[in-house]
Amino acid sequence: PTPLDDLKAALRFLTREKPNLLKMVLLASALNFVVLGYGAVGYAFVIRTQWGFDATVYGIADGLISVATLMGMLIVTMMAGRLKIGHMTKILTLLGLTVIPQGVACMLSGGNWTRLMALVAFACIGDVICSCANIIAVPAIQMRTPDAMLGKVMALLSALAMCMQPLGQMAYGWAFDHLPAAAIFIASGAVLIAMALLSASLFAHFDD
């Protein structure tokens, strides 16, 4: 079978036998669209273009966020046994609540350095929380997928994630060119909170 056949088989399996897994795969793809969109495009645009910091400052800020991501993964790995699918609603809500202050940071009147420190601080916290979501969502899909379909389902998840990344970057690139950065971050946080609330029943009845 070709890779396309595998993706079709995975989609048929999820649609007919595991609709909740399909919803989780789609939710993960939507999260990639939003998080990679504001993260990959927004930080560079705001720090370099709007606030006028040089490459060194941006590199340090990006490095701090990356370190926070790694630390988050280590911390979350140690807590993996305590993290359950039922925690996803709270985790996604908290993630949204770290993005909204990033929009508020863009409106602070204390100067660009104050804005930068606030943005990076909440971005670091958000990345740690995002690590929690990843450590729950991916194993949740893997553990509930039969061995015979596991490779196909994970390939579908990877394909959707790869598609969402450039689409998110293009959409957010357009948005940051035409809309205030503060509004984009605040709207993104609100979208994440809405996704959490709309998915609450999915997480509560995931194995039904």
Locate predicted features:
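Generic structural signal for secondary-structure transition and capping sites
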Residues: 19-20, 38, 84
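Transmembrane helical elements of multi-pass membrane transporters/channels
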Residues: 23-27, 41, 69
